[in-house]
Curated annotation (Swiss-Prot):
Gene name of this polypeptide: tatA
Entry's family note: Belongs to the TatA/E family.
Predominant location category: membrane
Compositional bias of kind Basic and acidic residues: 44-57
Lineage: Bacteria, Bacillati, Actinomycetota, Actinomycetes, Micrococcales
Keyword NAD annotated: no
Localization: Cell membrane
Source organism of the structure: Leifsonia xyli subsp. xyli (strain CTCB07)
Transmembrane residue ranges: 1-21
One GO process term, biological-process aspect: protein transport by the Tat complex
Subunit structure: The Tat system comprises two distinct complexes: a TatABC complex, containing multiple copies of TatA, TatB and TatC subunits, and a separate TatA complex, containing only TatA subunits. Substrates initially bind to the TatABC complex, which probably triggers association of the separate TatA complex to form the active translocon.
Membrane topology: Single-pass membrane protein
Protein name: Sec-independent protein translocase protein TatA
Length: 76
């Protein structure tokens, strides 16, 4: 995907980012990106643990059955 990028391409991209955001804002931007990535990784790991737990308990759950109570209420 990014195999065609060389060092010069990355240097130009970095220069454009510096021009757009300015040097003083970059540390705050990097901090917020790092926090977002940490939260994302935590959520992914939590979902994996939940998936493993479900597999250990038998996998799927039984679907809910309709008792017909809701259709009786709508007809009144």
């Amino acid at each position: 995907m990014l195999g065609g990028l060389t060092g010069w391409h990355l240097l130009i991209i970095l220069a454009v980012i510096l021009l757009l955001f300015g040097a003083p804002k970059l540390p705050a931007l990097a901090k917020s990106v790092g926090q977002s990535m940490r939260i994302f990784k935590g959520e992914v790991n939590e979902m994996k643990k939940d998936g493993d737990k479900d597999k250990g308990e038998g996998g799927s759950t039984a679907p809910a059955t309709d008792t017909g109570a809701s259709s009786e209420q709508n007809s009144k």
